[in-house]
């Protein structure tokens, strides 16, 4: 079982979140994790994993163009990602910066692929968020999210 974490990060905040989510995935035995910047990720890699988590900074209330391009390219695999586990996370410059709309724009693409999305009954309903550099709360959210993603991968695979 493997989870791929794909992200775009200009300042390093989203990258740090990706690494923290990977830390959470590693808590679950028999689930591997790979963390890659979107610029170094081929869309075909989505076919070879059981879980995908995508992270983006918030630009104008939505995902970065680099993430959008990656998701647009994934259309050629429509129907082939169904049943895989998906998730999203985001960082922004300020508290009203659009983290939830960014996450929802990513999740929309994953749901259209028929992926199973991991939510939370805690405060980070749609996925972890960070305002600026991840604080302790955001760090814990990321680690817990990664663990929940890995546990869901085991359940559905």
Where does each model-flagged region fall?
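FMN-binding flavodoxin-like domain, especially the glycine-rich phosphate-binding loop
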Residues: 3, 13-16, 20-157
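Short polar catalytic/cofactor-binding loops
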Residues: 8-12
């Amino acid at each position: 079982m493997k989870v791929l974490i794909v992200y775009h990060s200009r300042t390093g905040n989203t990258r740090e979140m990706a690494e923290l989510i990977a830390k959470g995935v590693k808590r679950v035995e028999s689930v591997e994790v790979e963390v890659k910047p979107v610029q170094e990720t081929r869309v075909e890699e989505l076919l070879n994993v059981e879980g995908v988590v995508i992270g983006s900074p918030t630009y104008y209330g939505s995902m970065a163009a680099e993430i959008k391009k990656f998701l647009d390219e994934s259309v050629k695999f429509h129907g082939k990602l169904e049943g895989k586990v998906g998730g999203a996370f985001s960082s922004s410059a300020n508290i009203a910066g659009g983290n939830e709309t960014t996450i929802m724009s990513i999740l929309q693409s994953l749901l259209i692929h028929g992926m199973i999305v991991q939510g939370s009954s805690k405060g980070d309903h749609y996925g972890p968020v960070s305002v600026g550099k991840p604080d302790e709360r955001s760090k814990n959210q990321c680690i817990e999210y990664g663990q929940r993603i890995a546990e869901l991968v085991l359940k559905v695979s």
